[in-house]
Amino acid sequence: MKTKVLSALFAITILLISCQETNIIKNLPDGSSSAPAVSGFFKKNVLVEDYTGTWCGNCTRVSWAMKEAEAISDKVIPVAIHNGNDPYHFPGIAPLKNLILPNSPLALPVSRLNRMEVWSFPETSNVQQAIDLTSNNTTIGIAMNSIVANGTIDLDVKIKCLEDYANLKLVVYLLEDKLYFLQRNYNLDLYNGENPIVSFEHNHVLRASLTDILGEPIGSINEGETVEKRFQIPIPTVTSPPNFSNIPQINPENISFVAFVIRADDNKAINARASHANENQNFQVNP
């Protein structure tokens, strides 16, 4: 009888240990750029940050490559960050420069994919590198809703996760399109070899960062949870850089937003989303 009792207790102990060590393994879908969409998962977009300048004759190479990438995929999120003797110089560029090139000067053009990955030279021959960072299937999604009116911005950014995430940061940019200015062009095979390009249309130009440009901590997000960040601010004013006067203020009709989530440990963007002003978005969920 004693032996039977001991055997039963041993069996119960093994059962308890087994239960404690059980791990639930989730089968996540293929996240490669060519994989078919799986219902319920989010689209994954690639963030392209183009450090550029109107004075930079080689910078047209990157702007051309971005347009080629956009023509291939609707999951490309471009941002043009102007620097130097430029009417659209972004004065808050220093933290970004120190992040991506801590020991080197910012010799333009410079381009980064998902904030930290170098876009291989020449970018026009490596468009697929950017496309390969997109996917039909990821577990974190972004949606934005905005009202831009009467000189003010009311913007909601929502982030939803299909698995647990930790140590996340959010970056939100305000961009402006349809800015026309002379652009130097040293690439004779691009833009018909015109140099300079008169009234070049500059789009996706970074005008303000609504968060810390290196990211605002949002901590952890649990599976199935949605977090929301709201911005209620006046449309930012811009100051004319040295050597330029009377640079127009931001045109509300040409405003757009880019929001992206980065991992705090390596500063890599894990998803991004672009939105026009006064657009109400749903999450990019596969049907």
What are these regions (language model features)?
Residues 29-35, 44, 60-61, 68, ...:
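Membrane engagement elements in two modes
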Residues 22, 50-57, 194-202:
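Short N-terminal helix-initiation segments at or just after the protein's N-terminus
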Residues 2-5, 15-47, 285-287:
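Bacterial Sec-dependent N-terminal signal peptides
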Residues 18, 55-58, 160:
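The N-terminal extracellular segments of secreted preproproteins, especially immediately downstream
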Residues 8-10:
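Exposed, low-structure sequence patches enriched in small/polar residues
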Residues 79-287:
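Short, conserved sequence motifs used for protein processing/export or organelle targeting and
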Residues 37-76:
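Local sequence-structure signature of Cys/Sec-based thiol-disulfide redox active-site neighborhoods
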